[in-house]
Amino acid sequence: MKQSLIFCFLLLTIIFASGYAAMPELESRIPSRCNCKAPPNSLPGLLCRKRCMAGK
């Protein structure tokens, strides 16, 4: 039981890490009109970029 829990945690960590590593690539696709003033890797920055990508 404990082993499967550890495995699950590792899997989630890997998925999260790979998604996070893809962020800079996403950054370059964001139109320049989205001048998000929050740091790109902070929550407000992420929300701002999401809104912008949605075209709002």
UniProtKB/Swiss-Prot annotation:
One GO cellular component, as annotated: extracellular region
Signal sequence, renumbered to the chain: 1-21
Superkingdom of this protein's organism: Eukaryota
Residues making up the propeptide: 22-31
Coiled-coil annotated residue ranges, if any: none
PTM sites of type Alanine amide: 54
This protein's name: Xylotoxin(2)-Xa2a
